Amino acid sequence: MRAMTEGLEMHDLLAVRRDKLNQLYDEGINPFGGKFERTHTSNEVIEQFAAFTKEELEEKDDHVVLAGRLMTKRGKGKAGFAHIQDIGGQIQIYVRQDAVGEEAYGLFKSLDIGDMVGVGGRPFKTKVGEMSVKVTELVILGKSLRPLPDKYHGLKDVEQRYRQRYLDLITSPESRTAFITRSKIIQVMRRYLDEKGFLEVETPMMHSIPGGASARPFVTHHNTLDMELYMRIAIELHLKRLIVGGLEKVYEIGRVFRNEGISTRHNPEFTMIELYEAYADYHDIMELTEGVIAHIAKEVLGTTTVQYGEHTVELAPSWKRVHMVDAIKEKTGVDFWQQMSDGEARALAKEHGVPVKETMTFGHVVNEFFEHFIEETLIQPTFVYGHPLAISPLAKKNEEDPRFTDRFELFIVGREHANAFSELNDPIDQRKRFEAQLIEREQGDDEAHRMDEDFIEALEYGMPPTGGLGIGIDRLVMLLTNSPSIRDVILFPQMRNREQGE
């Protein structure tokens, strides 16, 4: 019954707004106006005139022109106040019939919350000191035919915030700020890398063989070529081909697609930056990683100290570095530096309550120990390096202990934020790694790598020693905006169809 009542109320509200729309047409007013030239945004008016006293503003003769969405309206008789909202925030406007004329004031009185308006007038301060604009011209620029969510309660339904992001952006200053911050983060990242001599490139999003990561791909079909294609699960292998071709420092910021679960940390479509630098190794990439992230925080937030949930995180270099085996040994006492068989490693896992499959090798067990005991404890920025060979098919072997690789992952607030390594540039070894991955696929791991003959052929022409890095942009934005869910920092996250329910 309540839903039916709300439905009827909404129907009535929509009908009233349609009637107002028709009335505007009847009066010869275009409810969906054309180009409108502004002189200021709301924050620019406040910044330019806030330092003046009420009396000083009364003596000035400045004229400003603004446009935005009507968010509040009050008053009666021949004068009223309202707030309009634009990209800079909100500002109060004061509309008097004797200042704008009877026709324009009649338009003002008929306006609904949500309507787009343009105003011109003189900046002034009210008795309580609020920066405002005394309007002398007013036009409607876009009629809102649907009421906005209640201004005091906003969008309580989290799913509605994600489905109708435009409403979230209208009603939530915090959400607007988060997405503006996201844009600035990417701008600063680009500028940082450009200044270090990196070349931004674009590589295919549809691959004939999915590769560069352990993940399930989305599959599509090319009608003209009559072939199956895969949405990319990583950017890596094409960028390495460019290193082979002599482009020594390259990066790409782009979308990546993984046919996996949805959670507060995962969205099937997400944004990464991957970069590769010839003649560098993973130690160089560590320095680059902490440098770029600290620089972004300082430039965008003004500080390298950020708050994430209950944690205060310091991003100023240098960050902690720990070998994966040493971290496990310190926490559990288990020493994976010791030589042991796959079976002995699995036995240790069972002894310590770490779930493992009978097909898991030594390297997989080491990684399971790390994820089980260590990962979520790494709050401050920490480079964990020395990943097992079995889980790092594209990384160079460590020369001192070839069971491990010259690879690191960056963890902050218990989450992986970056993955990097000294790239494997030996085509013979790379083929063996892919063959080992094929065995894992046969054993049921559908995320294992496939054989990529074209990539191996590229390596056979010779690739210089190279350091590579991947950073998840969305998780970095989460960290720097104190956002609990990845869907809070992706404008239009993946959702179920409405008819499927939530």
UniProtKB/Swiss-Prot annotation:
One of its GO terms (cellular component) is cytosol. InterPro entries: Aa-tRNA-synt_II, aa-tRNA-synth_II, aa-tRNA-synth_II/BPL/LPL, Lys-tRNA-ligase_II, Lys-tRNA-ligase_II_bac/euk, Lys-tRNA-ligase_II_N, Lys-tRNA-synth_II_C, NA-bd_OB-fold. GO terms for biological process: lysyl-tRNA aminoacylation. Binds 3 Mg(2+) ions per subunit. SUPFAM superfamilies: Class II aaRS and biotin synthetases, Nucleic acid-binding proteins. Keywords: Aminoacyl-tRNA synthetase, ATP-binding, Cytoplasm, Ligase, Magnesium, Metal-binding, Nucleotide-binding, Protein biosynthesis. The keyword Aminoacyl-tRNA synthetase applies. Its cofactor is Mg(2+). Gene3D superfamilies: Bira Bifunctional Protein, Domain 2 (3.30.930.10), Nucleic acid-binding proteins (2.40.50.140). It catalyses: tRNA(Lys) + L-lysine + ATP = L-lysyl-tRNA(Lys) + AMP + diphosphate. This is Lysine--tRNA ligase. It comes from Shouchella clausii (strain KSM-K16).
